[in-house]
Structure formats: C-alpha cells, structure tokens
From Swiss-Prot:
Source organism (scientific name): Gibberella zeae (strain ATCC MYA-4620 / CBS 123657 / FGSC 9075 / NRRL 31084 / PH-1) (Wheat head blight fungus)
Record pathway: Nucleotide-sugar biosynthesis; GDP-alpha-D-mannose biosynthesis; GDP-alpha-D-mannose from alpha-D-mannose 1-phosphate (GTP route): step 1/1
Domain of life: Eukaryota
Main function: Involved in cell wall synthesis where it is required for glycosylation. Involved in cell cycle progression through cell-size checkpoint.
Identification of the protein by name: Mannose-1-phosphate guanyltransferase
EC number: 2.7.7.13
Protein's gene: MPG1
C-alpha cells in the first residue's frame, strides 16, 4: 500500500512555531504531527509514503530517517519547485503512486483524528469506484463546503455546495482520501486544486463516494485549532483508557486529560488540567496553574504562574506570578518576565517580554 501526505509550504498559520521547525515536525501531544499520520498509515499496511513538500525537505529527511528504519517503510520526498496546490503533487509523485495497481491514501498534514484507514480501504474496495473521501459532521455547515449525496444513495456524491445559505447537509471534506491510480489520468502537472477541479470531474462521472468519520476531527493548522485539537485528542485517549495519560490520581492533576513526558519535573502544590500536554525536560515550579495549554520541550514555568489557552515554545521561560491566556503563542526561546500579563498574541523566537500585553499582538 501507498500513501501521500500533502505537507505543503511555510506553515504561516502556525507561526511563530514554524519559524523554527517545519510544521509537520511541531509536536502535537508530545509527538511530531506527521508521526501521528505515519503511524496510522503503517497500521493500515502502508509501506511506501510520499511527502509532498516545497519547504525545507532536508530537515524532514534527516528527522524521518529513523522512522523509516523503525517501521520498515520507504519514505520519499516529492519536492515541488513551485506550489502545485492539492492535486498537482499527486501527478508529481505518479512514479511512486502508480508503480502498481493498488489504491493509495492521500491526507492533509494538518489533520488530526482517529484515522480510519483500514475501514476506509475496505469501504473503498466494496464500491469499486475511483475515489472515496472521508467526511465529518459539523454543527455549522454554513462555514464550509458541504458534501451532498445523490438522492437515495448514502455515499455516492452528487455535488459540493460552498458555504450554503440554506441547509443542504452537515458533512464536510475531512482532508483524508483513497484513490485508484486511474485518478492520475485526470490530473495535469501544474497547480491544480483537487477540491475544485478533480473532485467535480469525478462527481460528474459518478466515481466519488464519501465515508463517514467516527470520533473527533480537527485541522490543527493554526494556534486556536491546535489547542482545540489537543483537547479532542486527549479526550479520545481518556475514552480509550490510554496508559499514555498521567493518572488522574496524581495530586497535581485537576480535571484529567493530562499528558506529561516522564522526564518533566513538577513542583509542589500545582494544579494541572484539564487538557494539558507537557513535553520532555519541561520544568514546572511550585504552585503553578496550567489549563488547556501545550508546553513544548525544554520550557520552564516558574513558581505561581498561571498559563491557560497558551502554546509555550521550546526552551521558553515564564516568570514567577506571570499570567498568560487567550491564545498566546510563544516561539522558541522566549522569556516572559516575572508578574507579566499576556492577553493573547504571538511572540517571535528569542524575544523577552518585560511589559504587560493587554491587547493581543505580534511581538517582534
């Protein structure tokens, strides 16, 4: 089996984190985002994975070499000299994707969910047509492009309606697909949108089906969604009874859904949770309050600080009695002074915050 991950470019929506590392290598729940996807593909029997990239492929090649060996798979990089949108990368990787007649998976690198690849493969084979897209239900379909099925058919897609004014359905494209190799004949090697060009042509030929995703789903490509996706992921681990989570019986765990790397150090009288991930070598002082936040490797939170709805970048330090909230994102090696208040915004790498930030801003 084969799979292609649409990695894309600069990851601007997730800055300042992506100023330091490519977006797929940013840790989500203490594991690089792309590793979540690779593990799910491997579990479904995929042995050949293509990463479609146009930014810093050499960094990812070096990092992912160990996973090739660990999983016994082949990872190839398909490097775009110009951005090819969402369909062009499939054509660029045709040599690999069409090396045999088996279908192949495609997924967007920003998506985190309970990846259903094994069930998706079985469903795709059962209907025998060219493509299947995974769809997920949303509460406000008017914000999205909605999938509409043919009358009397539960999976065959009739059309897509972009941001419908009237209710026509509540299922949207989840950014996970499986295709037969024949789809490559529909795509030219140029910037091409799979959603706007390829899918409508497949629908016209009655060749595109949908598959309902069970469980959580989130595009975590920007900070507020990264935090929301973390909450959903941790809740999913709780429902599964995962041993990865820190035991709720620990005296510092408050509300559950807490994931702490074993190398992290936690001070006295802390209240951590719900929905917190703490990475390797993080140091938490005494009396610290953490809620709905992500602390990346090597960061430090000093005594009695309050951190909520915040992503703390690698090797950053939050001072004593500081308070951060309202979707604050600290880049790599940021220092927040003692007793400082930060009410949202982004702080670029290697900066020091010495005055309160009352209005969300970009600190350069």
């Amino acid at each position: 089996m084969k799979g292609l991950i649409l990695v894309g470019g600069y990851g601007t929506r997730l800055r300042p984190l992506t100023l330091s590392v490519p977006k797929p290598l940013v840790e989500f729940a203490n594991k690089p985002m792309i590793v979540h996807q690779i593990e799910a593909l491997v579990a479904a029997g995929v042995t050949d994975i293509v990463l479609a990239v146009n930014y810093r492929p050499e960094v990812m090649e070096k990092f992912l070499a160990e996973y090739e060996e660990k999983f016994g798979i082949n990872i190839e990089f398909s490097v775009e000299t110009e951005p090819l949108d969402t369909a062009g990368p499939l054509k660029l990787a045709e040599r690999i994707l069409a090396k045999d007649d088996s279908p192949f998976f495609v997924l967007n690198s920003d998506v985190i969910c309970d990846f259903p690849f094994e069930d998706l493969l079985a469903f795709h084979k059962s209907h025998g047509n060219e493509g299947t897209i995974v769809v997920t239900k949303v509460e406000e379909p008017s914000k999205y492009g909605v999938v509409v099925h043919q009358p009397g058919h539960r999976s065959l897609i009739d059309r897509f309606v972009e941001k419908p004014v009237e209710f026509v359905g509540n299922r949207i494209n989840a950014g996970l697909y499986i295709f037969n190799t024949s789809i490559l004949d529909r795509i030219e090697l140029r910037p091409t949108s799979i959603e706007k060009e390829t899918f409508p042509a497949m629908v016209k030929d009655n060749q595109l089906h949908s598959f309902d995703l069970e469980g959580f789903w989130m595009d975590v490509g920007q900070p507020k969604d990264f935090l929301s996706g973390t909450c959903l992921y941790l809740s999913s681990l709780t429902k599964k009874g995962s041993k990865e989570l820190t035991s709720p019986s620990e005296p510092f765990v408050h509300g559950g859904n807490v994931l702490i790397d074993p190398s992290a150090k936690i001070g006295k009288n802390c209240r951590i949770g719900p929905n917190v991930t703490i990475g390797p070598n993080v140091v938490i002082g005494d009396g610290v309050r953490l809620q709905r936040c992500v602390l990346l490797k090597g960061s430090k939170v000093k005594d009695h600080a309050w951190v909520k709805s915040t992503i703390v970048g690698w090797n950053s330090t939050i001072g004593r009695w500081a308070r951060l909230e309202n979707v604050t994102v600290l880049g790599d090696d940021v220092t927040v002074g003692d007793e400082i208040y930060v009410n949202g915004g982004s702080v670029l790498p290697h900066k020091s915050i010495k005055a309160n930030v009352d209005i969300p801003a970009i600190i350069m």
